[in-house]
């Protein structure tokens, strides 16, 4: 089965930097660790293409949409970041048989979204190595064309694998395929074995991509300084909607309106209405909440039609020439 590997370079770099710095091994081991990690990934499966994506060194295009985007990010001053960036640049230049994608104003998850979209159009699957949970909205599967997108990462010494909801249906369909082409059959078996090995070794989380996107739109994202769609000041602090509160709002939506469609023109209005009911505030607050939901959607949504045209054009041009 034709499958691509997408490696979030910022994820593997930061994971190694902090671990090596803690053990006073940064200068002697960073480059070796990066090389060994990519080598290990290459051996996982005969991937059609391997991509390494990185955030731009410049501000993201999202800063123009929301000027406080990622404003709370601070680098550890004890780490020699000049050395880290120099080492990482040399590592990227020396990579063989890996397509490196990085461009001004474009973030790693923008590249991941684009690669996945292009691959899925022609029936190619993707394995993403990242701890960026915005990527959860891209985890899905299809029978025609036939593909699946999964994500894996390691946090706190625990490796997780994120499968799209009901992925077993996809695997069962893959197993049942009758194909006279013995090479394609073998490819399918190899891919099934890879996913089975993941399932045996790693902690599995099942992801509903639409719910994953909406949960972040409702609750915001503190790590990126994206505010909650609704907040109230208590004891001098803004109290927004947390993960559990957002989950409760989505459950109420499904109970009242049925399964969620991102194409529903009344989606955000109905969510805002439920927020008003949950928080026991007047309906006059709906318009303000909808504006906040729309802002968060414009920042978090990784569907390509949500990207500014100039950004999408830059991504497309770089992708074609890499």
Q: Each predicted region: which residue ranges?
A:
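Extended two-metal-dependent nuclease catalytic cores across DNA- and RNA-processing enzymes
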Residues: 21, 72-315, 319
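Domain-level signal for Mg2+-assisted phosphodiester chemistry and nucleotide/NA-binding surfaces
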Residues: 1-95
